[in-house]
Amino acid sequence: IADNIGSKFIILDEKREVVRIILNHIYIDIANQVSSTIEGDLCSRDFSINSIAFLFDKKCLFDPLNGLKDLEISLLRTHSENNLLNDPLRILRCFRFVSELNFKIDFNLITFIKKNKGKLYLVAKERINYEIQKIVNGANALDAVLLIKKLNIFGTDNLSEDSFFLDLEKINYAELNQEEKE
């Protein structure tokens, strides 16, 4: 496909057969079907906006979870909490969507995040660091960081005392709060 449209091709996960095509700053991820049905695959994705497929045989989009509607209104919504629990890093990915794309997070997803934020300790620090870098470099970083603060994502009530998250408490929230008031 990449050769036919003159785009860049990157292997993201050779074992799971996931590749990315980049064309004019547009990223298209292509994955081999894992479930017995395309709907099963899409329903195992993290967010509805990532649960849209192009059916080559029918030349149309397949959107069983209404991801296109959520894209139109910039809403981040999940189909299944278990999909997020399979990789707790997805909790932080929510804030990256806020930071980079100015998405709003669905109320049910906020409730899930509050309930499960302590599971972030299960994720490798390097992966968390990558997401934090993406969050703080987004166009709406302040909104995302303030939401992270409001939901107490890195609060010590959820993490062990030797956690590297405790360093994040040193963020100058007073300065962030002042910027929010301006």
Residues covered by each model-derived region:
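Catalytic cores of the polymerase beta-like nucleotidyltransferase superfamily
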Residues: 1-182
